[in-house]
Amino acid sequence: DVVQVMEFLHVPRAVILGFSDGANVALETASCYPGRVSAVVAVSGNALPRGMSAASLMEVKLKYALWRGLEKVPLPRGVRERAVKSRQLLGLMARWPRLDKEKLSCIQAPVLILTGRRDMIRPRHSLWMGEQIPDSKVVFVKGADHFTLLKKEKAYGAHIMAWLRQRGL
């Protein structure tokens, strides 16, 4: 989808910034379309479902089972639609992304991985991602959790802009 939007807008190459699942999409795009990506900023992303903390992954799987079960019983229309959408989202989180060592090592663009030690993505997983991507930098934002980007966008923006300037982008 990212490359299709770029084609529609006549954008040959781009710096792609993604948050959470958007970070996963950005990394997948860089892996599959290396010629289209100048750089990636991946905020609170994961390469594999097991990159989530055990508690977060368990919560996702339990909620998935709950919503899946609710789809099988008679429900009012609005509740049924919510059950379907919730199950789809949680199923995505439980099974995707699938960016293994091979896919990450194919990324040619420089990558900035921003995360926090209190993120639902395990810090060790973020470091592992950085080890697999040839030109990457992992930055732990002090005191950050999964949603800190949405609360302290200026602090994240400063990290991002400094890194982009350093890379000449």
For every predicted segment, state its role.
Residues D1-A14:
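Conserved acidic catalytic loop of the alpha/beta-hydrolase fold
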Residues S53-K72:
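A catalytic-pocket lid/entrance helix-loop region that shapes and gates access to the active site
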Residues S136, F140-L169:
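Catalytic active-site module of serine/aspartate enzymes centered on a nucleophile-bearing elbow/loop
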Residues P12-G51:
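Conserved hydrolase catalytic core segment
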